[in-house]
Amino acid sequence: MLFDALLVLSFGGPEGPDQVMPFLENVTRGRGIPRERLASVAEHYLHFGGVSPINGINRALIAEIEAELGDRGETLPVYFGNRNWDPYVEDAVTAMRDDGVRRAAVFATSAWGGYSSCTQYNEDIARGRAAAGDGAPQLVKLRHYFDHPLLVEMFAESISVAAQSLPADVRDEARLVFTAHSIPVAADDRHGPNLYSRQVAYATRLVAAAAGYSEFDQVWQSRSGPPRIPWLEPDIGDHVTALAERGTKAVIICPIGFVADHIEVVWDLDSEVREQAADLGIAMARARTPNADRRYARLALDLVDELRGDRDPLRVAGVDPAPGCGYSVDGTTCADSPRCVARITG
């Protein structure tokens, strides 16, 4: 077996009111964000008792991965580490070292390229290995999976379920809107270039086709920072207003940029955008994210199997496909899969 462990690597989130501000300070360290701005964002978490859904979802996902491994008759210890909150990646890698793990696959809970979606996870891996010191396991970050058949299937199915929740008299006229986390235009230009935005656009087309939609919109959400800095647009709030002005009576929002119910989903969409839509007379349904779906667990293990040499990469073919990085080793920059495979098996 190529790997003797799997590390689920994620963003992290607070699990109590007293953890919210320290968590936000971790997230924004070195960026000079005013404390009053952090206090404003903290209110979003405090609305939910100071608990982000993300850690609980990831623990449930790990349970599904372990169950799937059991169904396959495989034994592979699964570890959990975060960038910004307990359990930290440094502690997870140190635990793997202490347990005698020599090489682990790393499944990041982000399907995309770009800095915060990919490169920063490589930095997390390097930081975790440095903390573990001598004897740290080799860590192989698995590839981008924005075009994996199971991801496309889960989102397409969730759109159909969301559509059925709309009132029958407006269901057939509902506008499908895909949304992902906005980033500064300059940041998108630097990576790829435009790797993140191209991948989101391509995945949007794949999911829309799988769900049976020929017309749809793709927008961005949750921007922050000074207004003078351009971010990817259009913003979902502006777009919902524009839809209302065009007479749209119902909207299905698919948060394709999120593999789980981050606070940006349960607050920005389920609270703020839903309230805005209601004020504008628009019925809104939100498609669910993969969260801890068993198919998401299978997706993670599919990526592991690709590096074991058991199968070719699973990808949905479409028009004008977006590129995706392969695998990276020990926090290095992503490279094409064949070169990475040679590096870890040679």
Swiss-Prot record:
Catalytic activity annotation: Fe-coproporphyrin III + 2 H(+) = coproporphyrin III + Fe(2+)
CDD domains: Ferrochelatase_C, Ferrochelatase_N
GO cellular component: cytoplasm
InterPro entries hit by this protein: Ferrochelatase (IPR001015), Ferrochelatase_AS (IPR019772), Ferrochelatase_C (IPR033644), Ferrochelatase_N (IPR033659)
Chief location: cytoplasm
SUPFAM superfamilies the UniProt entry points to: Chelatase
Subcellular location: Cytoplasm
Full protein name: Coproporphyrin III ferrochelatase
Source species: Mycobacterium sp. (strain KMS)
